[in-house]
Amino acid sequence: MRVLVQRVSRAQVTVDGEVVGAIDPQPQGLLALVGVTHDDDAAKAQRLAEKLWKLRILDDERSASDVAAPILVISQFTLYANTDKGRRPSWNAAAPGSVAEPLVTEFTEALRRLGATVETGVFGAHMEVELVNDGPVTVLLEL
């Protein structure tokens, strides 16, 4: 499982012209793009949620848990793109939707159980993501 985390001053996700998830933190929040591979499980989702919640990448070396920063979670199978051969990425390392969707949901729910305010995109939908990356700060978490 991979989570590409961006520190943001605002972010939103739109599906079919409708905003389905948005954060407008004061002053910062996190955008988490989540990719799932074949051997991932609920335990990995829980551990990554805990790591993200405590990750000290906000101002003054604080974490989202320290300042109740909101998190926007968006599924992102392209985090498992393989570009070793040719010019067209392979998505073979990405788990199929039937495996990935429940694990993205588990990741999201684990964050909520930890106390996070979480907004989400729509799994499998074509999404337009708008964000203002603060810093910029972008970190890849992987288990």
Swiss-Prot record:
Motif Gly-cisPro motif, important for rejection of L-amino acids, residue range(s) on this chain: 135-136
Reaction(s) catalysed (UniProt annotation): glycyl-tRNA(Ala) + H2O = tRNA(Ala) + glycine + H(+); a D-aminoacyl-tRNA + H2O = a tRNA + a D-alpha-amino acid + H(+)
Location in or out of the cell: Cytoplasm
Entry keyword Electron transport: no
Cellular-component GO terms for this entry: cytoplasm
GO biological process: D-amino acid catabolic process
Highest taxon of source: Bacteria
Broadest EC class assigned to this enzyme: hydrolase
Entry EC number(s): 3.1.1.96
Protein family per UniProt: Belongs to the DTD family.
UniProt function note: An aminoacyl-tRNA editing enzyme that deacylates mischarged D-aminoacyl-tRNAs. Also deacylates mischarged glycyl-tRNA(Ala), protecting cells against glycine mischarging by AlaRS. Acts via tRNA-based rather than protein-based catalysis; rejects L-amino acids rather than detecting D-amino acids in the active site. By recycling D-aminoacyl-tRNA to D-amino acids and free tRNA molecules, this enzyme counteracts the toxicity associated with the formation of D-aminoacyl-tRNA entities in vivo and helps enforce protein L-homochirality.
Protein name in UniProt: D-aminoacyl-tRNA deacylase
Organism: Mycolicibacterium smegmatis (strain ATCC 700084 / mc(2)155) (Mycobacterium smegmatis)
Gene designation: dtd
